[in-house]
Curated annotation (Swiss-Prot):
Annotated family: Belongs to the FliM family.
Membrane keyword on record: yes
GO biological process: bacterial-type flagellum-dependent swarming motility; bacterial-type flagellum-dependent swimming motility; chemotaxis; positive chemotaxis
Organism: Escherichia coli (strain K12)
The protein's name: Flagellar motor switch protein FliM
Gene Ontology annotations for the cellular component aspect, listed alphabetically: bacterial-type flagellum; bacterial-type flagellum basal body, C ring; bacterial-type flagellum rotor complex; plasma membrane
Amino acid sequence: MGDSILSQAEIDALLNGDSEVKDEPTASVSGESDIRPYDPNTQRRVVRERLQALEIINERFARHFRMGLFNLLRRSPDITVGAIRIQPYHEFARNLPVPTNLNLIHLKPLRGTGLVVFSPSLVFIAVDNLFGGDGRFPTKVEGREFTHTEQRVINRMLKLALEGYSDAWKAINPLEVEYVRSEMQVKFTNITTSPNDIVVNTPFHVEIGNLTGEFNICLPFSMIEPLRELLVNPPLENSRNEDQNWRDNLVRQVQHSQLELVANFADISLRLSQILKLNPGDVLPIEKPDRIIAHVDGVPVLTSQYGTLNGQYALRIEHLINPILNSLNEEQPK
């Protein structure tokens, strides 16, 4: 019986051990609270690269569209390109006001559908300015549908936007922008297979006088992913088209240069002693040439025959000598 009695030290050890055992499940529970389920099908894709070429396209488009709005409204708008947002489609859709003009577009030959979204504030500003208003009587957004007049103004703005967006892509990768249809409710414009799919959204802020509006161009990332390398590493500004434009410009400038064409009929070799003995009235015999070679700055450029035309001496060109002149003539811009 005495052997079964525990000492105080043993009792304390058992008590401490029991408390440690009880603390362990608590620690594991707290650790489990930090664990969250991960579903690779619904998580946001990480796009770390900066889409530099798309930024260039957006800036060019803003310039084109600014000119188009000026011609439409006869007022000078100020268009600011916002930062490109790479976000899930549901985040983009839930921030859209009501009513909103949603225009579905194709960028052929890319697969997929994009959106050009005009906010109601931009539509009302355009309608007000087009009919001579100055914004003193703002239109209230009441969740209603756009009127026929507003829809016609939207169509005109959309046409300008699609033309400008197509032109903006030409220097990077030519695309054909095609209008599909228009909607007012975002539930009818599912441009992605899942609400969590990533889209590339570019906001544009339009300011006309004291009034501001906004529109967006939203493209599924899967749509432009085939051009990902091109969008991350844009071609140099001196592209082939720009090089050709520069070359044509240079050719035009060179062709307007003033040059002196010299046609020598004959050359006579004389010694210095003979030249010193020359007197007025002396005759120097020369051989009449069949053809004359004309020079520019000492460089032979053409062969010709000579004669008279309308009482003046003239040259009839037979052919160009310098091959550079032939190449310049072929490269002359139409």
